[in-house]
């Protein structure tokens, strides 16, 4: 593989290193903020997915008898997570329901939240109006629910002007779903500073390790391109794109979510987001989603050792509700996908730029991404072959030597230690000064971060 420093792409932002937190999980527990820091997380989204359209922040309650953890107030979220973890915040305001739970969301309630956040440390940079309000699964008590015109008008005439009046410098966004039925109306009629898109690679029961690792991340890029096309058609080609939810399966997560396979998918997703110039992303979900074999896909065709799965990227402190038979694992323990974030945090630094990375030869299972790294170069290289190591030549155009090369690796062998409930982290090897190109051996099913100094 060859990196071309002259082929400069998008600016890199650490805001792609984001995760969701949910208001049903007690975020005041010791270890939550520390886990986010350990994984290199720089951005979070609150208060949840569909819960956002039933949640009322002033009373910390939800319509439709939704459960909210009493400790997980907005104030506690700021105090116990945001400040100690030093993360930037995106909030989804309630479009679906008013405080009386008998009509659509109230822009005044959203504006008061913006004002509260401004006076409370100004930690929230992004505000999205509603969650997946284009879908019938979402609470929407407007007279015409799940309707693009109703949504666009509500944003343009109510939410956007009132929220911007509360804080003119904040960013207010709308939800998008590529296609003429939603985006053409919303993007042409609403007011917005950014758009928010959600992506899940697979349907429950149809999970495939091969698809997830070999094709799913590239499918995300195709969808981002579709959003860009919709924005361009609306005359807003430069509008930032925020991928607010990411995952491998859109419901009933099984053992794939706790496996090395999802970690390798997540690492590629971060590479694709970086290459695409996405301004921000938050994976679903940091804590609060353990599930056992009674609900998700635990097929023997999927690789993994656990009798639990779930959206959580860190242990909730299992066993717990939803996976009562799981082997005990301390709260905050990094699961495989969190390790992918940890590795990528060595690459996704503000002020850097994407660089061209070309893979050639008989290495069909190898993927690579590259970015500047100070005066050096950072590569993220994947071996997607399950049983075979790959010897690859790594070169940088115009550079014949390096004063120091460091390689960080998370792979199948490290994950396999979890069969004994040992959740090992990445290894780091300092190779010292090297002539370029140099040959690296990539272990089976591995994500590798290679830092090449000048």
In which residue ranges do the predicted regions lie?
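Aromatic/acidic polysaccharide-binding cleft in carbohydrate-active enzymes
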Residues: 248-348, 352-367
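Carbohydrate-binding surface patches
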Residues: 361-401, 407-410, 445-448
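Conserved, mostly hydrophobic/aromatic
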Residues: 19, 40, 113, 127, ...
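N-terminal catalytic cores of secreted or lumenal carbohydrate-active enzymes
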Residues: 1-193
